[in-house]
Amino acid sequence: MSLVVFTALVGLLVAPVTVHPMIALTGILFIALGAGASGALNMWSHEDIDRVMKRTRNRPVPSGTVAPGEALGIGLALSGIAVVMLGLATNLFAAGLLAFTIFFYAVVYSMWLKRTTPQNIVIGGAAGAFPPMIGWAVATGGVSVESLFMFALIFMWTPPHFWSLALFMKSDYSDAGVPMLTVTHGRRVTRAHVLVYSLLLAPLAVAGAFTGTGGPLYLATALALNGWLLVGAVRTWRRDEAQAEADRYRVEKAFFRFSLYYLFLHFGAILAEAALKPYGLGGW
């Protein structure tokens, strides 16, 4: 959720318009509320999956802290409040985009894609990529090349991020009956997919330096991060399964952790470029 709020905040702050602080604050508040609503609906629909998986069994619903019906009620109520209040506080386009994001995550991804196809996180990754577009829409009332770039950056980042997790959590997904790529096609194929998507992600991320939100600082950051991304992806791809099991997937876990910092640092660089522009130091 922290990544959702941060990327939405970046999308809002780097838009080329002046936003009243109260509008910005309420916009981020209701986007965060929408993210919380999505999480509640996800826990309701995934109660059977979360109860089996080690990394999710302590969540409120599978642990018994919150009943499934309560999670559903909370999720629906928070969704309605978040969408309506965002529309009243900012604009209808941003509210509509938030409503679509909640629906896509809670219904299309959580209830359908995750349970039916190994491409679940490829298609479903769109849900996590919308927040900066919503933030941008709060500020401008629309979309632009820059907000579409931020969407694309998260969308292309999602598969290697989650597939690297699936490499060392394969048994969890298998036990829960989730058709992750590691379960349906094996780790060798998944490693190749991590490499391919990383090769697609790197030039896209670097190209962002030449959009309206880019600049020399972003370019330097992107070159360094994507160089390291490709090194990690190649190392992950080349790994022998026996070696990976022997060291408990040390390389795969390191790549997964790096991927978290990767996205935060890219968006941090985008935000820094915007902060430097008033002083003539950001952008080209």
From Swiss-Prot:
Keywords: Cell inner membrane, Cell membrane, Heme biosynthesis, Membrane, Transferase, Transmembrane, Transmembrane helix. It comes from the Bacteria. It catalyses: heme b + (2E,6E)-farnesyl diphosphate + H2O = Fe(II)-heme o + diphosphate. It is found in: Cell inner membrane. GO terms for biological process: heme O biosynthetic process. The keyword Iron-sulfur does not apply. Pfam families: UbiA. The chain crosses the membrane at residues 2-19, 23-45, 69-89, 92-112, 121-141, 148-168, 194-214, 217-237, 263-283. InterPro entries: Protohaem_IX_farnesylTrfase, UbiA_prenyltransferase, UbiA_prenylTrfase_CS, UbiA_sf. Signal peptide: none annotated. Belongs to the UbiA prenyltransferase family. Protoheme IX farnesyltransferase subfamily. Carbon 2 of the heme B porphyrin ring is defined according to the Fischer nomenclature. This is Protoheme IX farnesyltransferase. The gene is ctaB.
